[in-house]
């Protein structure tokens, strides 16, 4: 049983090295100061091994709680603090966690459960909907992912990362773990790109590494990359869904002119989460790809005839592949069910040098602002109102097809309330469209492909 503090190297770094800051910080929290915070939480949480629900904020204290709970030997489920109260209650009822961190309060339930010795962290498969289905990750999974990211992005101890992505989101967590692995500082923030104070704050903390999902890069394109006042910025990374080619090129050209690097990446929470990274120098010739597999992983295309360029399901092999899923407390006792092999559910092909191009998704999972959304789960929530809705993703919005109704305004208001009560996506992510009938297949099933 190995805890995250040991694997990420926090215990071995120079004591006075700057490591973390957040929105309330006046100065960097050093390795030694963080170590003291972690040890305090470890001692407070000492006792039988338990499941911890951590509605984790992007703060130094939130990270100290995570590492402290891990040091005490507990398993931590990282959850969205903005989840509606009912969604939180449903998760607690299902899993009965022994410890809950929520809004700076700590509740000790005192409920131990059977946890596999290798299990370290749980991440939701659809964080914005509070899905009860978790990805089970070992400390070794997270360590392998962090090591590979450090290597492929060449992260060094002087590179300050912007920790604006939520820590319950696998991409946000990987920014933190990879930089801790390299001994590199991270400035954590709860602010977003559209907050007027965000950019001056990034300049103040001398941000060199800016990660983002398609929403962030589209926003920067509209705002104007050249208006960014970040003198230290050298690395930009993009994951969390497909970015349109125009925005890819603008981002690449902007950072290239500064002597920096732009990396397109691909991953899944089930891979802790990184699978591929496109090198900056390969962008011009291979901008449509997401790059080759990580140094410690490999990709095969199932259903293809073996020739480069032949489409099939993307299968990833690597030490960062999850242990498996959990849908109830009993599953938390299970060991590794994957054997380092992940069937991604995505369709794609490899070129002669092993670079992957993604051409589609085989499952009904979407991504809005980088957050994974189970479209079937959203659809079920609306259909519980007694009206039939069909949901598909269109770019950065969810489009709800519905049949004519005598009082459409009232129906939309009921639908929006149901969505806001259950999920954390903003109302701007929801659009409605009236149709006379739903397109269906010959088996009378909804034809989602045609609607898309």
Where are these regions (language model features)?
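Gly/Ser/Thr-rich phosphate-binding loop
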Residues: 207-212, 221-285, 298
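Conserved AMP-binding A3 loop
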Residues: 27-32, 119-147
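Conserved AMP-binding/adenylate-forming
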Residues: 40-82, 164, 372
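Conserved ATP-binding/catalytic segment of the ANL
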Residues: 313-376
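Conserved C-terminal "lid"/linker of ANL adenylate-forming enzymes
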Residues: 366, 396-399, 417-452
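Conserved AMP-binding/adenylate-forming core of the ANL superfamily
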Residues: 15-46, 88-89, 140
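Conserved pre-ATP/AMP-binding loop-to-beta segment of ANL
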Residues: 2-4, 8-18, 108-124, 131, ...
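Conserved AMP-binding/adenylation subdomain of ANL enzymes
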Residues: 143-160, 170-209
